[in-house]
């Protein structure tokens, strides 16, 4: 009977765990839908700013913004690492941190030191364990990222590049592909490539065959400067939004897998309990029959 009591205790424990994982799965599914909506809503803004900046840059070809000038001579490299603040999201953080570590080794092989910005608690902890130089960080963004919370940390990297202190700035995050798939990516944020700002005049452009004619206040250079900063900030925000959509998707999938595994364990324990109970009943019946035969 002690064995049966122990099995009953295990069944109850796993059932309680399954209730928790099932609830977390439902919460993650709800948050995932909202995160995907924010991610999709952020894309048109960055695209529009890029298109306007492209046309304005072509209107002032003699001016080259610092973000579009290479700093090859600098011995340091900027790096923005986007991760989650919480765990229980499968191997999502592990994958992007593994890719980041590989990139760090590659940069080290080129004689570059890394000056990093961490967005998310998991990434900050990782960088601290590596004893990497963390120049800025932002954690506890919550379920809804706000650009004003990111600007301060990101501005540190932008200023370092504008001042020629870093040769490039990289951005690492988890790209949302679909609910079942998320992939770690590392993109070069700065310097901006000229291809990004080639003026488009085709059906894919939001304003095809349109003549752009602006009156600049105070002047075109100032407006371009401001637009390019906004564009880079929008790229970082888009990465954070994609990372959050990936987080909720990965968490939902992980909690569903945990719930399914818990159900399998419960079924196996229930089978063991039934076998133990059957054996105990058979033993009692055998003892009764044996006693009756002795009488």
Swiss-Prot record:
One of its GO terms (biological process) is proton motive force-driven plasma membrane ATP synthesis. Transmembrane segments: none annotated. One of its GO terms (cellular component) is proton-transporting ATP synthase complex. Belongs to the ATPase gamma chain family. Disulfide bonds: none annotated. NCBIfam families: ATPsyn_F1gamma (TIGR01146), PRK05621.1-1 (NF004144). Produces ATP from ADP in the presence of a proton gradient across the membrane. The gamma chain is believed to be important in regulating ATPase activity and the flow of protons through the CF(0) complex. The gene is atpG. It holds the Pfam family ATP-synt. CDD domains: F1-ATPase_gamma. It is a peripheral membrane protein. InterPro entries: ATP_synth_F1_ATPase_gsu, ATP_synth_F1_gsu, ATP_synth_F1_gsu_CS. One of its GO terms (molecular function) is ATP binding. This is ATP synthase gamma chain. Coiled coil: none annotated. It is found in: Cell inner membrane. Keywords: ATP synthesis, Cell inner membrane, Cell membrane, CF(1), Hydrogen ion transport, Ion transport, Membrane, Transport. The keyword Transmembrane does not apply. F-type ATPases have 2 components, CF(1) - the catalytic core - and CF(0) - the membrane proton channel. CF(1) has five subunits: alpha(3), beta(3), gamma(1), delta(1), epsilon(1). CF(0) has three main subunits: a, b and c. Its main location: membrane.
